[in-house]
Structure formats: structure tokens, C-alpha cells
Amino acid sequence: MAEFCPRVRAGSVEYRIIDHGPHWPPIVACTVDSFGTGKLADCVQPGACNTKERRLISMAKLRSMHDAIAEFVPDGASVALGLQLEQMIPFAAGHEIIRQHKRGLTLIGPISDILFDQLVGAGCAEKVIAAWVGNVMMGSAYNFRSAVEQDGLQVFNMTNFTLALALQAGAMGVPFLPTKSALGTDTVKGNHFFYQIFSPFEPKESLWAVRALNPDVTIVHVQRADAEGNAHCWGNFGVMLEGVRAAKRVIVVAEEIVAAEVISSDPNRTVIPGFLVNAVVECRYGAHPSPVQGYYSRDDDFFHEYHAETKKKENSDTWINDWVYRVADRQAYIEQLGTDRIEALGVNQHAYAAQADFGY
């Protein structure tokens, strides 16, 4: 893992040295003037500049979790998150949304785990566009269920596939995409995301047009990214790529920020290009209790505990107070979990990919 020195600020752009050891050249701090040119500054880590090959790296997109949510998730926004199905759910970002008391949000996701339930329970959500909301380990999500029963939440039912189509249409810049997927189901009843059409090539062929979705912001969790937002991710993508490309703004939360050379060394794993990204947040264990392949496994006990401790509104409020409001940030959250619990979630059986040669 990279070792980070203290950040330095020069003008309006921050820089810091990232030392990845002998295989990667260290990155040195610099200043940037109004014309975007770089000038090497004094090293803030002794010996880090003793190399013929220096790299400049802009920190303009790097944010704390607090600042990223404050800047890019306004009240009333439509927010796509949890797009990778049951893994890499951006819980840390969701908890920061709760801490900042965001209101009137529209939550967008496929089969959506307990993060949606927490956001609903905290009063952040006004609408939900999803295929399912619940606790993947236990079934029902009590805050969501109660809100629906009391007509306190507007819900638009989707399937995983029709949600993918809606986001893909948004990414393509077209108003809809056709499908046969929802034919003969109740998914479309009272749902303005579906409109019956007929094929222009086979006039008697009935189809459903799925309305495009363009989230105001998409939040994703990945294994690693550079400071410009170019992100490596492996494992189940779910509908993450569609959600990123359809969004007006994108926040990438990464387990670690690495040098650009690390990202460019494996271009096929760079599934999110930096030009789509507005903010990059480094947040270790930011997806807990969901798993991140290669970093940590699912905390099954946490899902069981959440199920047992949130059956009633007053119990849910206590849980949110204990795990969100009274926890200053993700580091405090991890400390509350405890070292033993974190260590127990470490990768037990590594499954390394074969090395690829990109040479000619």
C-alpha cells in the first residue's frame, strides 16, 4: 500500500507525495499557476525526490467524504448508489449523507441493501427507484417497509434489467430503450417509467419503452483510483458502469488512492475514466459491511445485528445514532467496530488473476 506524506496546498490545488516503493517513481508536490503549468516545489518527504523520473499529480478532485457529499449531493437530488448489487456498497458515503441531514432525495439502485433502509429511516429519502430494498441476509428492511405501509415514501418498482436499461438509455442520451422484459408483469402498473409501444418493423409486436434515468449524482465504491478519478474495479459490476455514464456528477470512493502509473499499468481494469469523475474520496473500509474483493469479506454478523436491532422505529433511531450520528467519520466507525472484527474480515483465500503482458 502507498505511504502518504502530509498534504500541501499551493494556490487552489493540493498535492502530496505518494511513494509506492522501488517499482513506481514517487510523486512530488508542485504548484500550479492560473495557466495550469506545474513547477516543482520542495519535497515534503525527505529523499522522495531523489529520482530522475518525477511525476506531477493534481489533487483538484480529491475530497474528504464530508466535502464531497456537501458539494455534490444537494437536497432534492437523485442519487444512484449500491449499483454493484451486494458488494462494494458505499456505506461510508451514505452515512455522511445522513450526518449532513440531506432531505428530499430520490434513491436509485438495483437490489438495494440496508443502506437504502438506513437512508429512509433517517428521513433522507422522498422517492425510491429500485428493484428491491431489504436486508440480503435476513429479508425485510423495516424502515423501508414501514415507510411504504404508511405512504411516507414514493416507490417506483423496477427489475434489475429494466433499471439497467433506464440507466443505459440515460448514458446513451436517448429518451428510452425498448424491452420485452416486463411483458405480462405488474411491474409496469402505475409506473411512469414504462410506456407501451409497438415495433416499427413488426407493428403487432408489443414492447415496453423504459424511460431514461440520469441521476444527479452517482456514488460508487472501487478498489483503487488515482487522484484524477481513473478507477480500477474488479468483481461484480452490476449496473455501476451504466450508472456512472448516465450521471450528471460522479463521486468515486476508493479503498486507496494510487499513482497514475499504477492505474495505467492495467488499462483494461480502468473501468471508470477520470473525465467522468467530479470527486475522489479515499476511504478504507468504506463499503463495510458489504465486501470488497481482494480487500475484505462480507460482515455477515453485522447484517444479522442490524436486522435484530431495527425492527421498531425507536430501535432504528438508536442504531442510527450509535453508528452514524455519534460517529464522526469512517475512522471512528472502524474503531467502534474493533480491531479483532476488522482483522477477521480479511481475505482468507486469495484468487490472483494471471499476469497480462500489454507489450508488442
Regions from the language model: what does each represent?
Residues 7-9, 16, 54-55:
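Basic polycationic patches enriched in arginine
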Residues 58-360:
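Conserved alpha/beta enzyme-core scaffold
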